[in-house]
């Protein structure tokens, strides 16, 4: 689609060209004139404002423009029909699209200067051409200026470069191609030259207060950019400098992560400052207009809100005010390929908060904050008001407060939300324009002037432009209620509306000091969708999760693609004869234009065709976007995506090993019966000194036998961590267990911060026979391989010191397994950009078939409360098209407050005790419908808070309310710093939930996990969690399950926290308990509360390990599915240097049915079955689970 300009008060006359022109376009432009236009493009005043001349037209129906970013191949053989705009009779111009596949495509104009007195925003690629809502008065002094045809002019100085200055005087502008207003006289196909690039003007996009925007082709490439040519009028020169400085500051941040437009460079052309931006597709206003101003569903408003709030959060952290946030300045990046992916544009009105001046004219009127209208001091909160107005407009399809004047604006606000507070009105410098004080009263109060009074004073007639008039904002929840929702979906919609209105009221708080902040907005339930946890079976909820998929962190291709680009360069321009080119160092090139070459040797998959969709598979979680992520520059990141196309992977084996940073390798379509394996980057197992060799991947590791087909999955050893090239990356992205040789010689914090992690890892990957052992599996049985980690106890003379410190251990689980259902040829992307010292916070279920993008997405929630009482739940939501149930449990506690109190003083106490890591989930066969009920009741566990609780200096809060879904008991973490023993329950209705996290010196408490009752089957599960926002929320970042990260306290003195890898069955099933009765674990406190056995519910399977595990290892328990008559297990053979010798006992207590007693079946597993191992840290034991229904390939 190409621009559609409506409302031009002119007609078109077409002239044949004098000469043939060579350009980026190879087709001609045809213009169609349609009469009876309702919109007028004429008129520009001191603020370049335009209103409709027609009295009967609503004042907020401007025209829309849409532009294609496709670029035809240059063809000099085709002539151009030159287009010149003349003033004339009323009509509007419809410019058909410029097509890259047909010579009938259109090009706007020829080598003529083209100027249009349209009034559009600064950087809007598409601007409405009727109403300019930032305007104040109407001046119809001129419509269109005609420029004589002339060839492109390039003025050269002595050095041969284009004359470039930052600021010019009025005298200079008179002879530099500018008119009296300072606008540059644009010429079609003119070449704009920076010091490094040349840009050919293709077409005019719009005009704003500070200049105009043109669509340009970057010569020598296939890139289309938008160039904003600022006016060189003295009144705009200063603001232009401010905009350049702000863009230069933003260029140091990730434009994709923080959702603002990417600026490429700044240069001077004929004394005009030119800003080069990425080309975006369509603004939200035109999107609304294209949809006939129909209301936008909340499930689409949510991702837009989240992305813009993320941008405002970054601006607030930088002390910047956007000051012109409106639908026209929120651009859809690529609606067809990335639905509702938006970016904030137009920083022409932006300023630093320290330079904010009262009574400054800021913001478009519809979105103007009360403090601006009243002349109060203001800050970044004005942007939050604007965002509230924007989302209200998306919800209503019409502006909430469409005031034709500032009086109408404050009148609308006061009628709906009440008068501003007395102290605000009294302090406002412009209050008396709109309010009168009742002097007769002993307590004089402000009252709003009547429309007649205001008109009598100012001569401005009050108008009523509202489509909806609300007595209060709560009434908005009743409008535009959808009628196509039934049952639970309608309940979901109502709950969603309640949260939306709640957030909207906080955003539209008249008092700016009480207005919600961007961080609080991102943590609001409407954004985090915690209020939807009660409807896990709803298809509407699933759709909400899928729509939020766009909010995930994006791969920063700049680190690998643009290293050869010009760095940030600023040439000071003291005079008009000095060149100035400023190259912004922020993602100089879009990822789809340049990508690393495909290289199977480095596991790099570059696919320029689909790389624009290359997102992180880490789940978005609020306030995580504040993390500045740094990708390892030594390893190329893949840019392909399985959702678009499946390409053969570089390895044609049945087993694919995906190291961190290279996750998401697609399985070959010819290997449907094989394994698509994802390496869980959970815990580096360090058993040697820091001088260990970095990880090397040998081809022998990937040469596997053809395993039986079926929906099978495997979790590879988490110790396979590093590639050689990663050693140069300084930001640590893995949690590491302290090696024994290092624990006694070096402080943890120093080792954590000063060394690259690449050299600390055990080179166990160099053993060719690592996976050569063949695992015999039934073809119909899926395989789950669990990994449990434990640190071996180091015998020292300071055991008593460890005992005294044991109560300070913090139970922490910072990693979970990801069990997803996906076709073998559809592997989700798993690339991730990582920042040092940022804790993993969330997880994601990504389930999609081949050539589709069906993603279930969830994210953590950082609660606004600062208490230690936190809640977590396992969310089970349906995920299409696969009905397979996936359960993910997230547990990530941050104990920064306690960790900051003390630095580690004992190197011995950094070792962990023998602890068993368990995960319990329910598992049951699924069906193809979304109404399969999980009949397991919730178990309440109370009264155990004093049984095994230790005396901690900080105390424990043992009260938590809610329904338990899943509880994970992670291993103990012993450190010298004072940390509470905390174990947050995933269900809020567990009284004394912290009993499961209390440990004696040599005892480990076991917790029973109960499966919460859900009213429907689920194929995706996300664990939401609420955390208190500590003072270091900037260190939070979405967790990519295949690349978990390590958390550190802000003072960099806290101990390491090891991440645990868990595997969960793909079917919902009954809870299981894992009590460990062994001398090394001391007294067991299982706190079991058996659930009522329903006819379809299996018995609680109990696995016992009667033999002492000693100090040598741990075991991962996976249970057989219900209804299975035989419970067989095959142990994978691993080399002795990998696994411990761990007894695995599965006695007759493992029953296939709750009605079958142990006497009916003999013991199917021999007691004291040993797996050949050595004292490393992990055990790999696979147990068959429920039969596979479909040929799915879960990824871990």
Curated annotation (Swiss-Prot):
This is Homeodomain-interacting protein kinase 2. PROSITE patterns: PROTEIN_KINASE_ATP (PS00107), PROTEIN_KINASE_DOM (PS50011), PROTEIN_KINASE_ST (PS00108). Residues 600-800 are annotated as: Interaction with DAZAP2. The modification Phosphothreonine is found at residues 141, 252, 273, 482, 517, 566, 687. Ubiquitous. Abundant in muscle, heart, small intestine, stomach, kidney and brain; and low in testis, skin and lung. Interacts with CREB1, SIAH1, WSB1, CBX4, TRADD, p53/TP53, TP73, TP63, CREBBP, DAXX, P53DINP1, SKI, SMAD1, SMAD2 and SMAD3, but not SMAD4. Interacts with SP100; positively regulates TP53-dependent transcription. Interacts with ATF1, PML, RUNX1, EP300, NKX1-2, NKX2-5, UBE2I, HMGA1, CTBP1, AXIN1, NLK, MYB, POU4F1, POU4F2, POU4F3, UBE2I, UBL1 and ZBTB4. Probably part of a complex consisting of p53/TP53, HIPK2 and AXIN1. The record marks 923-924, 984-985 as: Cleavage. Residues 923-937, 991-1046 have a biased composition (Low complexity). Sumoylated. When conjugated it is directed to nuclear speckles. Desumoylated by SENP1. Sumoylation on Lys-32 is promoted by the E3 SUMO-protein ligase CBX4. Autophosphorylation at Tyr-361 in the activation loop activates the kinase and promotes nuclear localization. Residues 793-829, 938-951 have a biased composition (Polar residues). The gene is Hipk2. SUPFAM superfamilies: Protein kinase-like (PK-like) (SSF56112). Residues 97-230 are annotated as: Transcriptional corepression. Residues 50-69, 792-847, 891-963, 991-1058 are annotated as: Disordered. Residues 839-934 are annotated as: Interaction with TP53 and TP73. Belongs to the protein kinase superfamily. CMGC Ser/Thr protein kinase family. HIPK subfamily. Residues 539-844 are annotated as: Interaction with SKI and SMAD1. It comes from Mus musculus (Mouse). Residues 984-1196 are annotated as: Autoinhibitory domain (AID). Disruption phenotype: Inhibited terminal erythroid cell proliferation and terminal enucleation, as well as reduced accumulation of hemoglobin. Impaired transcription of many genes involved in cell proliferation and apoptosis, and of erythroid-specific genes involved in hemoglobin biosynthesis, such as HBA and SLC25A37/MFRN. Enhanced stability of CTNNB1; accumulation of beta-catenin leading to the potentiation of beta-catenin-mediated cell proliferation and tumor formation. Small eyes with deficient lens, abnormal retinal lamination, and thickened retinas. The modification Phosphotyrosine is found at residue 361. InterPro entries: Kinase-like_dom_sf (IPR011009), Prot_kinase_dom (IPR000719), Protein_kinase_ATP_BS (IPR017441), Ser/Thr_kinase_AS (IPR008271), Ser_Thr_dual-spec_kinase (IPR050494). It is found in: Nucleus, PML body; Cytoplasm. Its EC number is 2.7.11.1.
